[in-house]
A protein has these predicted regions:
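A structural detector for beta-sheet-dominated domains
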Residues: 12-16, 25, 70, 83-87, ...
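Compositionally biased low-complexity segments at domain edges in trafficked proteins
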Residues: 92-203, 284-336
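Sec-type signal peptide cleavage vicinity
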Residues: 1-39, 43, 58-59, 64, ...
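Edge beta-strands of extracellular beta-sandwich domains
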Residues: 76-83, 268-280
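Tryptophan-paired
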Residues: 26-71, 223-276
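Structured domain cores in non-transmembrane regions
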Residues: 32-117, 129, 201-206, 210, ...
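Short, surface-exposed linear segments at secondary-structure transitions and domain or protein termini
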Residues: 48-49, 86-96, 233-240, 278-288
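Long, low-hydrophobicity ectodomains and other hydrophilic envelope-associated domains
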Residues: 183-254
Length: 336
């Protein structure tokens, strides 16, 4: 009997900044199917939530990990041994999230996600959805580890925050790790040690508030097409038609960057962008309370927008608006 091919996924390993890079001694990703999977070769890279690099595809359904690593900036070895919540994993493995509101051959209304299993891959012409594609590990100071599930380029969801344990008896690990290094442990410590290293900033980014984004404008011809959220906790969310017109309230982290696309007529398509300070925006959400409304109010001339939190002005670090040309279903340019 021909063996069933296991679904593929990529693994990413990242750190908050280049000051907090780590190196691995050993690693194993456990799968529901029982086959082995592993981390990419080398140390962490990229930014919080995104490594910026790929590796050999892994196979199966990830359900846990056993990882031993070295944080040079703390001169400490850690072990992360964790089981992921199985019911949650099974649920998310069945989901395929919408990536684009473009003009695919599928004429059905989009949904945030459908239960399509593991083999959906986004295609601008044929398929709006993407199944689980990347398992992302983020390593912060003091053994803080966050794991995300990524679906294509548009959606990234935090699976959980975990705590690695300090390994005190580490001489054998030191021998193994530094055997082929050009520097020894003392030299790495002298170069990288940071007594102020703390996970607090990245723990703070995980704070959530119950709120909903709303896009409004006085132009009766306003059509909304897409809204992309990049949160400080590294999650990504995309809102498309039709639910962009009535985005549900749920617990969300503080936005780092948002962009949204609208039209008010033929050849009148615009994208607005806003960038936020975590400290200032978090203070505003603290005062706003639960079930808040984050409103983006487009000016009648489409050249700017204002931001309100529960009808009170909310200042962004910067905002931008410019014209664009993207194909969407229901566009005034009739791309269907």
């Amino acid at each position: 009997m021909k063996q069933k091919k296991l679904p593929e996924f990529q693994v990413e390993i990242c750190s908050p900044t280049n000051d907090y890079l780590i190196e691995f001694v050993s690693d194993k990703i456990f799968t529901l199917e029982g086959n082995g999977a592993s981390l990419p070769y080398g140390g962490t890279s990229g930014e919080w939530g995104y490594s910026g690099s790929g590796w050999t595809e892994q196979h199966g359904t990830p359900i846990g990990a056993d990882i031993t690593y070295y944080a040079g900036y703390e001169d400490t070895f850690y072990r992360l041994k964790v089981d992921f919540p199985l019911d949650k994993i099974k649920d998310y493995m069945e989901r395929a999230y919408a990536q684009s509101g473009g003009t695919t051959e599928d004429k059905a209304s989009l949904e945030e996600y459908k239960r399509l299993g593991r083999n959906e891959r986004f295609s601008a012409n044929y398929n709006s959805y993407n199944s689980f594609s990347n398992l992302v590990f983020g390593f912060a100071p003091k053994g803080m580890v966050v794991v995300w599930l990524r679906y294509g380029m548009g959606v990234r969801i935090e699976l959980g925050r975990y705590q690695a344990e300090v390994i005190k008896e580490d001489k054998e690990l030191e021998k193994k790790l530094f055997a082929n290094w050009s520097m020894n442990r003392q030299e790495v410590r002298a170069r990288d040690f940071n007594p102020e290293a703390s996970p607090q900033e990245w723990d703070n980014y995980r704070i959530r508030y119950a709120y909903k984004p709303v896009i409004t404008g006085e132009n009766k011809a306003l059509r909304l097409f897409e809204m992309n959220y990049h949160y400080y906790n590294a999650e990504l969310e995309i809102m498309l038609r039709p639910w962009i017109n009535n985005i549900p309230i749920k617990k969300r982290a503080i936005p780092k960057e948002i962009s949204f696309v609208w039209e008010t007529g033929k050849d009148q398509q615009f994208v607005g962008r806003a960038y936020f300070s975590w400290e200032k925006t978090n203070e505003a959400f603290k005062k706003a309370g639960n079930n808040a409304k984050l409103e983006f109010k487009i000016a009648p001339d489409n050249n700017s927008f204002e931001i309100f939190l529960n009808d009170q002005p909310l200042k962004a670090d910067s905002t931008r608006v410019f014209k664009t040309e993207s194909e969407y279903k229901d566009s005034y340019n009739n791309y269907n």
